[in-house]
Amino acid sequence: HCPDPETEPDAFWNGEEFLAYLKKTTLKPLAPNYENWYAYYHLGILEFRKGNDKIAKEMYETSLKLQENAWALHGLACLSIHEGNKNLAALYAQRGMELKRHCLSYQKEGLKILSQCEAYRAILQQYAVMDEDMKSIGRVQYYYALGLVKTGRLEEADKLLNSEEGIVVDDVREGEDSIQDLWEILNHELYGGKQILPFRYEFHAN
């Protein structure tokens, strides 16, 4: 199975038996998957989950050599974060985002990785080249506002958060108050803490 890199990967198989089978059918020169980018990507995922970072990196890199793909780049970004190399992780994430420019889920994941890397200028650069529909997504707007705040563009962030529409994030996780945190930073820096937090940003109100 060697899908087009443009398509999202299938659900992954797990388990030692499948890993052994995949190695057997992939790693030797005459193996049927020897030049299959997807097989090496899959091996990278499985090895990373087992904590075999070095082998996972080799698998992801081989996948990329065979066929540049956003999925192995994402794997390398996650691996680089795990190893504490935020600068490299941010580079991998940005290249992946370039390849999947019109895939909302990939773009949101890329912005998340960039925020974990504290690559706030990169967040702003990626946001700038998104289409207008994608820019209107609440989760995307949150990362944009984060980038604005962290790069000192407080007035622009304030205009976004305190606009009539505000930022509406439909996929807020339980216990997540990151938009509230941003608003409180702006309130402190721009208004001396005198503003009242809008109810829409009180994610623990209920």
PLM region descriptions:
Residues 34, 67-68, 101, 134-135, ...:
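Short coil turns that delineate tetratricopeptide repeat
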Residues 38-42, 71-76, 105-110, 138-143, ...:
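Alpha-solenoid helical repeat scaffolds
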Residues 26-27, 60, 93, 127, ...:
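Hydrophobic/aromatic packing residues within the alpha-helices of TPR/SEL1-like helical repeat arrays
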Residues 1-25, 132-206:
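Eukaryotic alpha-helical solenoid repeat scaffolds
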